[in-house]
Amino acid sequence: MPKHGKKYRNATEGLDLTVKYSVEDAVAKSLAAAPAKFDETVDVAICLGVDPKYSDQMVRGAVTMPNGLGKTVRVAVFCKGEKEAEAKAAGADVAGAEELVAKIKEGWLDFDKAIATPDVMALVGQIGRVLGPRGLMPNAKTGTVTFDITTAIKEMKAGRVEFKVDKAGVLHAPLGKVSFGSEKILGNLKALIDTVNRLKPSSAKGTYMQAMAISTTMGPGVKVDPTLIKKFIEG
């Protein structure tokens, strides 16, 4: 088992990682335990009561964080004609069709999010093996295949997060930076939970949100008592 560094040990001193806390306390303790000198990212992991091997239990979606994510998001837009000018006017870092696909085939990947208009998806499919594994492939289910590129770009820039459960039924998402403080992190977490709850599959049985943990880039995972999540949402 790997040994943790001195900063990590000092930060977690007095923190019982076996205890499950309220959502508010878990966030506060996670922020207080962030050991690094840089502004760490705060993340959440949520274990859902779904079986992703069944397509009707795959939970996938997107949410625009009300308090942003505290980082610059570089957006690439696959589009043609007038849409290219619209994309650049809306704040896209790069926009185009054939020439953009060719550039990516050559190894260029200097962007964080990708959007495409429906009419160029056949072209984008040529680089699916490049974009897919990196989570960059535009997808209609998450609103990144659309003719309304202005709205999509603005949402991306504002802190839009796409998520889906992994094979174990766990969903991971960033909530912002440690410097945000508890209030802004909790606001983003509430928006995420609201969205995930709306996406609950009708075929999912039993407890939907089975476990949750809050962590920072270099910090420990602080567990949340799942029975208190509803109280947090309604509070």
From Swiss-Prot:
One of its GO terms (cellular component) is cytosolic large ribosomal subunit. One of its GO terms (biological process) is regulation of translation. InterPro entries: Ribosom_uL1_bac-type, Ribosomal_uL1, Ribosomal_uL1-like, Ribosomal_uL1/biogenesis, Ribosomal_uL1_3-a/b-sand, Ribosomal_uL1_CS. The keyword Membrane does not apply. Keywords: Repressor, Ribonucleoprotein, Ribosomal protein, RNA-binding, rRNA-binding, Translation regulation, tRNA-binding. Part of the 50S ribosomal subunit. This is Large ribosomal subunit protein uL1. The gene is rplA.
